[in-house]
């Protein structure tokens, strides 16, 4: 049932697994579901993968909503590419399930589902979604997205939502003499834990406390 799906997603909040699969029932000939299909008022595909389209508990619309949530779960959680952003986004939603479902509807409404997106573009869409919610303090979400980008790689292209790096580039260069081999990013917020319960490593330093090394 839909409520059960939501509860399973809440269990994820406690366990914080690195991967979570949101599966769908199939009606295979000879299986328990096949024998009880009429009792459950199950309507399912006549061809592989024989997925259930609706039951007496779940409408076709419910199934479609779950599929949207599943796709966003794969993109934003199971990919492990947006851990801090997702952790933060959860705090302004009733549950993780509602978060992924609503995000899926946002993708659908804007025609993003059928497109191929880069990781930075996925972050941009996530921020567009947050902006659509009317969040007062967007800066913390901008910086969370920046953290997710630079904690994985020294991105060649600066994300358009990120702060202008030029304001502290000369100062931080003293700590990164080899430039392209290192990156120091400055944040106004402390991100203590990501969506997987892992502690966030100190990739950031405070610009106001930087001191040039003496030779």
Locations of regions flagged by a protein language model:
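Radical SAM enzyme core and accessory elements
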Residues: 71-210
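Single conserved hydrophobic/aromatic residue that forms the stacking wall/gate
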Residues: 1-7, 11, 209-215
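A structural motif corresponding to the C-terminal lobe/cap of the Radical SAM core domain
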Residues: 5-8, 12-98
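Extended interaction regions within the primary functional domain
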Residues: 48, 205, 215
């Amino acid at each position: 049932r839909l409520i059960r799906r939501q509860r399973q997603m809440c269990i994820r909040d406690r366990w914080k697994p690195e991967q979570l699969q949101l599966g769908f029932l199939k009606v295979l000939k000879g299986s328990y579901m096949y024998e009880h299909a009429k009792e459950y008022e199950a309507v399912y595909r006549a061809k592989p993968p024989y997925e259930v389209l609706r039951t007496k508990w779940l409408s076709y619309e419910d199934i479609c909503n779950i599929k949207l949530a599943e796709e966003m779960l794969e993109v934003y959680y199971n990919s492990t590419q947006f851990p801090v952003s997702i952790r933060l986004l959860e705090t302004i939603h009733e549950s993780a399930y509602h978060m992924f479902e609503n995000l899926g509807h946002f993708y659908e409404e804007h025609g993003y589902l059928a497109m191929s997106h880069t990781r930075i573009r996925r972050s941009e869409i996530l921020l567009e979604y947050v902006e659509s919610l009317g969040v007062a303090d967007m800066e913390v979400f901008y910086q969370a997205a920046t953290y997710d980008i630079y904690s994985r790689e020294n991105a060649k292209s600066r994300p358009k939502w990120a702060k202008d790096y030029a304001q502290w580039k000369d100062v931080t260069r003293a700590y990164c003499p080899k430039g392209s081999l290192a990156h120091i990013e400055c944040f106004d917020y402390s991100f203590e834990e990501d969506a997987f319960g892992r502690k966030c490593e100190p990739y950031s330093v405070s610009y106001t406390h930087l001191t040039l090394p003496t030779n």
